[in-house]
Regions:
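Short amphipathic alpha-helical coupling segments at ligand-binding clamshell hinges
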Residues: 3-7, 97
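C-terminal segments
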Residues: 6, 10-58, 114-175
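Terminal or standalone catalytic/regulatory effector modules within metabolic enzymes
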Residues: 101, 105-108, 119-123
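A general structural motif
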Residues: 60-68, 86-93
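Alpha-helix capping/termination and helix-coil
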Residues: 50, 54, 86-106
């Protein structure tokens, strides 16, 4: 966990304090819906909306949270450079949280995992079996890997992603 956190920091991400996390919660979701004012904005702009001072060069705002319940604003799709980071005590707990996020966020879309796919094939297969998603990305950025092309040549490039029967769609591939 700490190694990943340090790598995020090294790459220009900003970890929010507890107070800053709470302030950003009040900006992410407004009246039960994603706040349109954060969509596509920079991390610096979003932080400013929450009254948080971060360097202009900040790439991503990260809140360390525990809950994956819908009541946790960080557990929603945010369409912006805002991430939740979860610390778990076991692989099983990580998979359970991932399953819940997929369930609440929408079956069929995309899941991703960073793993040594040569030495941890059993773990990878378990992940693939448990995630009810049409795209399971391995060791690639999920936001760009899911749309194909630059980070993933195995998927047709598209900004329209089918979610298959899990998501109530007629197609499961990139359209």
């Amino acid at each position: 966990y700490e190694d990943v956190k340090n790598e995020f920091i090294r790459r220009g991400c900003y970890f929010l304090s507890e107070e800053e996390t709470e302030a950003l919660r009040n900006v992410i979701i407004i009246n039960g819906s994603l706040n349109a004012r954060i969509v596509g904005q920079t991390a610096h702009t979003i932080a400013s909306l929450a009254g948080i001072d971060v360097p202009k060069t900040t790439k991503i705002l990260i809140g360390e949270v525990e809950s994956v319940d819908l009541s946790e604003e960080f557990a929603h799709e945010k369409l912006s450079p805002v991430l939740a980071m979860y610390k778990v005590s076991s692989l099983s707990e990580a998979f359970e949280k991932a399953e819940r996020l997929v369930k609440d966020g929408g079956f069929g879309h995309t899941s991703s995992i960073y793993i040594n796919d040569r030495t941890e094939t059993a773990t990878l297969l378990e992940f693939a079996e448990r995630m009810k998603t049409c795209r399971i990305l391995v060791n690639t950025p999920s936001s760009f890997g899911g749309i194909g092309d630059v980070y993933n040549f195995n998927l047709a490039p598209s900004l329209t992603l089918g979610c298959g029967s899990w998501g109530g769609n007629s197609v499961s591939e990139n359209v």
